[in-house]
């Protein structure tokens, strides 16, 4: 198949391009900076055509889709603070543009990369694809929720949109040290605050392989979870320390203490005070209210098994 990937110079997107190429697909990357495509893909040992454009621009999106069969939409604006601005433009407007143009040009499938944050924070013992969506705690979360509702509208209309909600993504060869890596770097450089609860860890290579396997036409609208392996925060620290070959400094805290500290850091940032620890009140709430995800249907349908967290962390810090 001929597949367009948005966000192909990002972490998930670049690995998805590599997985698609390994599966024998012809890949085009829609990028605002097309000169970055070859540079980002080089460490992964693959090449792809680059098309200049922005997911918020209908004309460049339509031009990139011409002559192609399917699209995997991984482009997103990540952030948990500040005004909605670019988050709305990319996460909502960009998603609407991609879906609209893909439907108009009869692409099949249209694969959308969602996030389990749409379900968080949650008091449920386990999150499933049918779990209730959470009330957003930040402009970023609000934009992802709005995008998710938009995707579900397209699915309800019968369009061949496959959505896959992924968890905390880690692994090797990240073009940009952001997102999950902020927590890793902060924990390794200073100290890890360890609250009750846990988190999901999914390897970027497993995520990419799943997205590549989802690029199958004729399946109609589908929704999947790919949160990954669940670990407690205590296990997270232990596994990361083993991967780094060091005993990590840690301090156990209660959920209330963690949330209060996140709120204090938010207040300091508003006052222009630089805070080295990548913790916000929203992040603290989610850290203490993130249940496991039931990915069994996803793994069974796509005949996939997740790498161990030890392997993922080992390759992350390498």
Regions found by a protein language model. Give the residues of each.
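Conserved Rossmann-fold NAD(P)-dependent oxidoreductase catalytic core, especially the SDR/UDP-sugar
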Residues: 93-140
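N-terminal Rossmann NAD(P)H-binding glycine-rich loop of SDR-like oxidoreductase domains
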Residues: 3-25
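Mid/C-terminal beta-alpha module of Rossmann-like enzyme folds, strongest
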Residues: 210-277, 295, 300, 307-317
């Amino acid at each position: 198949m001929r597949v367009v990937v948005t966000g192909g110079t990002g972490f998930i997107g670049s690995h998805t391009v590599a997985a698609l190429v390994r599966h024998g697909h012809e890949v085009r990357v829609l990028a605002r900076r097309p000169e970055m495509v070859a540079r980002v893909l080089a460490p992964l040992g693959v090449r792809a055509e680059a098309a200049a454009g922005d997911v918020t621009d209908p004309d460049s999106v339509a031009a990139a889709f011409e002559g192609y069969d399917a699209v995997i939409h991984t482009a997103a604006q990540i952030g948990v603070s500040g005004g909605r601005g670019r988050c709305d433009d990319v996460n909502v407007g960009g998603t609407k543009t991609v879906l609209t143009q893909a439907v108009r040009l009869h692409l099949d499938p249209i694969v959308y990369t969602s996030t389990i944050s749409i379900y968080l924070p949650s008091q449920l013992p386990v999150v499933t694809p049918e779990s209730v969506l959470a009330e957003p705690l930040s402009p970023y979360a609000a934009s992802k929720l709005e995008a998710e509702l938009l995707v579900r509208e397209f699915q309800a209309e019968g369009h061949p949109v496959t959505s896959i909600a992924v968890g905390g993504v880690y692994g090797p060869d990240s073009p940009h040290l952001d997102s999950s890596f902020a927590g890793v770097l902060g924990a390794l450089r200073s100290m890890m605050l360890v609250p009750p609860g846990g988190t999901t860890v999914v390897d970027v290579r497993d995520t990419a392989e799943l997205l590549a396997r989802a690029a199958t036409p004729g399946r109609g609208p589908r929704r999947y979870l790919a949160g990954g392996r669940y670990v407690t925060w205590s296990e997270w620290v232990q596994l990361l320390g083993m991967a780094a070959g060091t005993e990590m400094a840690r301090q156990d805290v209660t959920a209330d203490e963690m949330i209060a500290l996140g709120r204090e850091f938010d207040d300091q940032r508003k006052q222009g005070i630089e805070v080295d620890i990548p913790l916000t009140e929203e992040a603290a709430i989610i850290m203490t209210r993130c249940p496991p995800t039931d990915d069994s249907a996803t793994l069974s349908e796509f005949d996939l098994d997740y790498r161990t967290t030890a392997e993922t962390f080992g390759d992350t810090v390498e």
